[in-house]
Swiss-Prot record:
InterPro entries: Acetaldehyde_dehydrogenase, Acetylaldehyde_DH_C, NAD(P)-bd_dom_sf, Semialdehyde_DH_NAD-bd. GO terms for biological process: catabolic process. This is Acetaldehyde dehydrogenase. Its EC number is 1.2.1.10. One of its GO terms (molecular function) is acetaldehyde dehydrogenase (acetylating) activity. Keywords: Aromatic hydrocarbons catabolism, NAD, Oxidoreductase. CDD domains: ALDH_C. It catalyses: acetaldehyde + NAD(+) + CoA = acetyl-CoA + NADH + H(+).
Length: 305
């Protein structure tokens, strides 16, 4: 079966984990890994796998995109450089999947709104953040039952799983995640908190979701909705688990989650990498299937859609 060729920008924790997942895909074929440090572990690993690499940043990739047939590019760098990366990639007629909190394109949280992106012709979609991918499905599970006045999420991740790019983007992480809690999760007001835990041995990713419903919560309907959403997320992140909840206290609905990774790059405690990279791969596969069917024709654009 024909596969759609992909490039990855950013050979850090997220990019390296994503590369492992793309290599198992039936419709995606990673052919380039782009970095800025020739000595980086991620570039070395990619080279060993037979992937083409450049340490000249996105400018080292652009001249080769057409010849190598690259149609989908993943950006796992930093929010600060994403807009420029996206502009250059879109000009080449390739779709950009943004794993930074830049959020210049529409948010995509697969179990909630992936189908809404089908046929919309976007050239840039944003995967929110790892905390967003873990928690927004649960906010949406409550808000599809009844209106949510306020949604608050707390993502706790191990220090070892948080690379320099993510650390530089903490403010963007909280802003972007809070925005997506509203736009995708359906809460009228959203708030996001990230906790980076330095404990050794490293702790598994844990997430807490609190929703305040406008009226008294329909406990049976919300519980059923949460369990249905849990099953949807587990289709692409098998280590996504409901630890407790939904717990009801007045109008507050609380859900407690943990996310175990597949251990593709970092060990299984780094579920935050897995949920982000699995969601990005799932999204890219949907676009790739559309391209292969001839239903999506990518057009060069001057700016991201």
């Amino acid at each position: 079966m024909k596969k759609i060729k992909c490039a990855l920008i950013g050979p850090g924790n997220i990019g390296t984990d994503l590369l492992a997942k793309l290599q198992r895909s039936a419709v995606l074929e990673p052919v380039w890994m782009v970095g800025i440090d020739p000595e980086s572990d991620g570039l070395k690993r990619a080279r060993e796998m037979g992937i083409k690499t450049t340490s000249d940043g996105v400018d080292g990739l652009i001249p080769h995109m057409k010849a190598d047939g690259v149609q989908i590019v993943f950006d796992a760098t930093s929010a600060y450089v994403h807009a420029e990366n996206s502009r250059k990639v879109n000009e080449q007629g390739a779709l950009m999947i943004d794993l930074t909190p830049a959020a210049i394109g529409p948010f995509c949280v697969p179990p909630v709104n992936l189908k809404a992106h089908v046929g919309s012709g976007e050239m840039n979609v944003n995967m929110v953040t790892c905390g967003g991918q873990a928690t927004i499905p649960m906010v949406a599970a409550v808000s599809r039952v009844q209106p949510v006045a306020y949604g608050e999420i707390v993502a706790t991740v191990s220090s070892r799983s948080v690379g320099p790019g993510t650390r530089k983007n903490i403010d963007e992480f909280t802003r972007t995640t809070a925005g997506a809690v509203e736009k995708v999760g359906g809460a009228r007001k959203g708030k996001a908190i990230i906790v980076i835990n330095p404990a050794e041995p490293p702790l598994m990713m844990r997430d807490t979701v609190h929703c305040l419903t406008e009226t008294e919560p329909d406990q049976a309907a919300i519980t059923a909705s949460v369990h249905a959403m849990l099953a949807e997320v587990q289709k692409y992140v098998p280590g996504y688990r409901l630890v407790n909840g939904p717990v009801f206290d007045g109008n507050r609905v609380s859900v407690f989650l943990e996310v175990e990774g597949l251990g593709d790059y970092l060990p299984k405690y780094a579920g935050n990498l897995d949920i982000m990279t699995a969601a990005a791969a799932r999204t890219a596969e949907m676009f790739a299937e559309e391209i292969l069917k001839g239903e999506l024709v990518l057009q060069p654009t001057a700016v991201a859609a």
